[in-house]
UniProtKB/Swiss-Prot annotation:
The record marks 465-466 as: Cleavage. GO terms for molecular function: structural molecule activity. The surface (SU) and transmembrane (TM) proteins form a heterodimer. SU and TM are attached by noncovalent interactions or by a labile interchain disulfide bond. Residues 1-47 are annotated as: Disordered. This is Endogenous retrovirus group K member 6 Env polyprotein. It comes from Homo sapiens. Residues 466-486 are annotated as: Fusion peptide. The chain crosses the membrane at residues 633-653. Retroviral envelope proteins mediate receptor recognition and membrane fusion during early infection. Endogenous envelope proteins may have kept, lost or modified their original function during evolution. This endogenous envelope protein has lost its original fusogenic properties. SU mediates receptor recognition. Expressed in testis, and peripheral blood lymphocytes. Residues 1-89 form the signal peptide.
């Protein structure tokens, strides 16, 4: 290869530099993110607030801690810039830039729960055996066994003390309770024959007689039938136990601490010595009757009990009645007899049979009670939605009024497999919550308002020079307006009636009715009817809110109200506390908020949906009437006279022109007829005189 060929093949150095320049220029302009476009809705950003800077500093500090980087001013600045860059570069969802309208919304039956408190009405608890446990019976529970025991972590608030069962502060403690009936006997040595039932119940305080709250509890004595003074007598059939509610002579205190004072007026039967006419060495000289400790042990350890004494055995506080605890401090609430049905089902009940015999020892009467048990009855108690049971390590914090539980289980039924190392918290579905929501358009009560607004934007803003075009299509516009208004009113009505009820029923079934679908074949049962009444009562309250509120037309599952959300008045922390169910001085004032929203709804209910928009259409069309343009001009008599003369002159001119046009038309018609006659003559003018020719032509 000669030097000339090498020079020809080697690219010139200057050309290489010239080809690299455009690439460098393009690399400088290349970006990895999408091109940012300024939209019409884009607004100028406001300067950052102190709260935003404080939050940015916290995020930067947390980032440096996670990355184990020393916190210096330079690193803090770089971390803050990185966070701002990441937030700004996040993709914005469609329509988010235009979501500048925030209103209060009422969401009925959200997927949230709250604790049932002592101030709530009693809960329906169903049992599978009403012979041994009084109450409504239902042996079909749980409806969804595969869903029992689902794990959940809760952190909810409360205002009144919550209902909790178990060995924990703020919960009612479990204990064994006995109920005794007397069976007639004819044996000469047998004084009495007994049937006794033992089961789990609610544990009273040991020193309840000395407690200062006992005297105060006397004023809360319920109005009911007093308990009998004799042991109830029943037949020899051990499978029959008749429960009869009664009020004991004294109340027992189940709880008296910072969580409140809980009392119970049901009888607490137990064996003790009858010391009537005996010496002071009788054990009943104690202030508190001697309780048989053996009977309060585990129900599975002993199947035979023997009580022996030189003093007669008596059964105190007669009556076959279930516990009915109620709160009396710091507030007074209703009785809750359903709680005992949950505790008694946590372990099988044991049935005892025995008698009391009288013997002689050392020339003294000797009394012996023999009790034997060979029968146990397993039980199951269940609740139905909207109620559920949270089982686990429940912690109640009275200072912050919060309830927490990690790795808890959601149940609807309790049976003999329950472990009392856990606690039971009774919860229910939230009836509704108030939350602020954002919309990409202003609040509208009816779709007719939205449709007519769009129509008016394209019609009423036109110039008056299009008056003749508007008149040509005026009937079409009226038809569109009427159709839109009718459709808006119809859709508004359907949202609050058929569609809303259908969506509400579907959503509520998916959320809370998944475990308890009412069986149509057994719908005539009383218990199903009672539960349905409770279930529908909450729905009626929700519907009552919907009828009182004016909602946005484009929502059906919840109601967006016309009340604008004011962040300065209700900050998000208040909303968060409301969602947690906490009610304190810092919580959202729901009653005040409801009054404001109802007032705003009343203002919008004064007009039928679409009436305001239709009135705007009528005013706009009236402005396009040409008569109104000169209405203000013809306000004087002289101007009116001039206008009349001008109109008469124009009319005269039109008449003169019409007459002239008519004469010209007649002349042209005659000439055409003459020409037609002359063209039809075959011989022309031969044989006729000149006079005739002249006359003919002149015609």
């Amino acid at each position: 290869m000669n030097p000339s060929e090498m020079q020809r093949k080697a690219p010139p150095r200057r050309r290489r530099h010239r080809n690299r320049a455009p690439l460098t220029h393009k690399m400088n302009k290349m970006v990895t993110s999408e091109e940012q476009m300024k939209l019409p809705s884009t607004k100028k950003a406001e300067p950052p607030t102190w709260a935003q800077l404080k939050k940015l500093t916290q995020l930067a500090t947390k980032y440096l801690e996670n990355t184990k980087v020393t916190q210096t001013p330079e690193s803090m600045l770089l971390a803050a810039l990185m966070i701002v860059s990441m937030v700004v570069s996040l993709p914005m969802p469609a329509g988010a830039a235009a979501a500048n309208y925030t209103y209060w919304a009422y969401v009925p039956f959200p997927p949230l729960i709250r604790a049932v408190t002592w101030m709530d009405n009693p809960t329906e608890v169903y049992v599978n055996d009403s012979v041994w446990v009084p109450g409504p019976i239902d042996d079909r529970c749980p409806a969804k066994p595969e869903e029992e025991g689902m794990m959940i972590n809760i952190s909810i608030g409360y205002h009144y003390p919550p209902i909790c069962l178990g060995r924990a502060p703020g919960c009612l403690m479990p204990a064994v309770q006995n109920w005794l009936v007397e069976v007639p006997t004819v044996s000469p040595i047998c004084r009495f024959t007994y049937h006794m039932v033992s089961g789990m119940s609610l544990r009273p305080r040991v020193n309840y007689l000395q407690d200062f709250s006992y005297q105060r509890s006397l004023k809360f004595r319920p109005k009911g039938k007093p308990c009998p003074k004799e042991i109830p007598k029943e037949s020899k059939n051990t499978e029959v136990l008749v429960w009869e509610e009664c009020v004991a002579n004294s109340a027992v205190i189940l709880q008296n601490n910072e969580f409140g004072t809980i009392i119970d007026w049901a009888p607490r039967g137990q064996f003790y010595h009858n010391c009537s006419g005996q010496t002071q060495s009788c054990p009943s000289a104690q202030v508190s009757p001697a309780v048989d400790s053996d009977l309060t042990e585990s129900l599975d350890k002993h199947k035979h009990k023997k009580l022996q004494s030189f003093y007669p055995w008596e059964w105190g506080e007669k009556g076959i009645s279930t516990p009915r605890p109620k709160i009396v401090s710091p507030v007074s609430g209703p009785e809750h007899p359903e709680l005992w049905r949950l505790t008694v089902a946590s372990h099988h009940i044991r049935i005892w049979s025995g008698n009391q015999t009288l013997e002689t020892r050392d020339r003294k009467p000797f009394y012996t009670i023999d009790l034997n048990s060979s029968l146990t009855v397993p039980l199951q108690s269940c609740v139905k939605p909207p109620y559920m049971l949270v089982v686990g390590n429940i912690v109640i914090k009275p200072d912050s009024q919060t309830i927490t539980c990690e790795n808890c289980r959601l149940l609807t039924c309790i049976d003999s497999t329950f472990n009392w190392q856990h606690r039971i918290l009774l919860v229910r579905a939230r009836e509704g919550v108030w939350i602020p929501v954002s919309m990409d358009r202003p609040w509208e009560a009816s779709p007719s308002v939205h449709i007519l607004t769009e129509v008016l934007k394209g019609v009423l803003n036109r110039s008056k020079r299009f008056i003749f075009t508007l008149i040509a299509v005026i009937m079409g516009l009226i038809a569109v307006t009427a159709t839109a208004a009718v459709a808006g009113v119809a859709l508004h009505s359907s949202v609050q009636s058929v569609n809303f009820v259908n969506d509400w029923q579907k959503n509520s079934t998916r959320l809370w009715n998944s475990q308890s679908s009412i069986d149509q074949k057994l719908a005539n049962q009383i218990n199903d009817l009672r539960q349905t009444v409770i279930w529908m009562g909450d729905r009626l309250m929700s519907l009552e809110h919907r009828f009182q509120l004016q909602c946005d037309w484009n929502t059906s599952d919840f109601c967006i109200t016309p009340q604008i959300y004011n962040e300065s008045e209700h900050h998000w922390d208040m909303v968060r506390r409301h969602l947690q169910g906490r009610e304190d001085n810092l919580t959202l004032d729901i009653s005040k908020l409801k009054e404001q929203i109802f007032e705003a709804s009343k203002a919008h209910l004064n007009l039928v949906p679409g009436t305001e928009a239709i009135a705007g259409v009528a005013d706009g069309l009236a402005n396009l009437n040409p008569v109104t343009w000169v209405k203000t001009i013809g306000s004087t008599t002289i101007i009116n006279l001039i206008l009349i003369l001008v109109c008469l002159f124009c009319l005269l001119l039109v008449c003169r022109c019409t007459q002239q046009l008519r004469r010209d038309s007649d002349h042209r018609e005659r000439a055409m007829m003459t020409m037609a006659v002359l063209s039809k003559r075959k011989g022309g003018n031969v044989g006729k005189s000149k006079r005739d020719q002249i006359v003919t032509v002149s015609v």
